[in-house]
Amino acid sequence: MWIGIISLFPEMFKAITDFGVTGRAIKQNLLQIECWNPRDFTFDKHHTVDDRPYGGGPGMLMMVQPLRDAIQVAKQVARSEDGVEAKVIYLSPQGRKLDQQGVRELSANRKLILICGRYEGVDERLIQSEVDEEWSIGDYVLTGGELPAMTLIDAIARFVPGVLGKQASALEDSFAEGLLDCPHYTRPEVLDNMPVPQVLMSGNHEQIRKWRLAQSLERTWLRRPELLDSLALTDEQRVLLAKIKQQYKIS
């Protein structure tokens, strides 16, 4: 997978290019990341990349020309190898809120270009002409789009074949099936008088599977019940959830 990044602070992305799962994926050529800095597309001696908004108000906007030129170069690089166009994403609080389903959808793209805004944002006309989709990582404001972009890259990379040592890991993550993850345990068998659940020691894979599913359902119902509203539960899940509610004396 190829990801192009438009950012005034490309150095920030060393956090994902040099470390962890994404860093290994890049070394193995499973993931390719290239950055373009709009400052490199300016023509004045100060490398100006911001300008005042029409209508007044506090703050500045990113200048159109350097940003658009950077996007155009990224698009050209994306299509130069095999003619495949990259989908252009603008990280914005006004965008669709990122969830696991969204991550799956985005991971199906071979090429993405992520635009990281700064200041008070970018000219609306640039969004209309250059951006395919807007995405948000939550209902809060950050100083720039770099951290959301890194979050998006990390989440997407888990679905790139070969990035994880075991592909099942991505399928079993929290939210992979719309449910929160079940509890996990490792050694020692007893920690501060708290033992590992006996079913996990049994070696019975079917019982372990059912226990984990029940735990995921219970956690989701207790902590994020709204997630269940959008799920088409299987017969097994409905039965387990009914038993869980009965245990809490709620029908």
Curated annotation (Swiss-Prot):
Main localisation: cytoplasm
UniProt record, GO biological process: tRNA N1-guanine methylation
InterPro entries listed in its UniProt record: Alpha/beta_knot_MTases, tRNA_m1G_MeTrfase_C_sf, tRNA_m1G_MeTrfase_TrmD, tRNA_m1G_MTases_N, tRNA_MeTrfase_TRMD/TRM10
Annotated S-adenosyl-L-methionine binding sites: 117, 137-142
Disulfide bonds: none
E.C. numbers: 2.1.1.228
Gene3D superfamilies named among the record's database cross-references: 3.40.1280.10, tRNA(m1g37)methyltransferase, domain 2
Subcellular location: Cytoplasm
A GO CC term assigned to this protein in UniProt: cytosol
Sequence similarity: Belongs to the RNA methyltransferase TrmD family.
Function of the protein: Specifically methylates guanosine-37 in various tRNAs.
Complex and partners: Homodimer.
Protein name as it appears in the record: tRNA (guanine-N(1)-)-methyltransferase
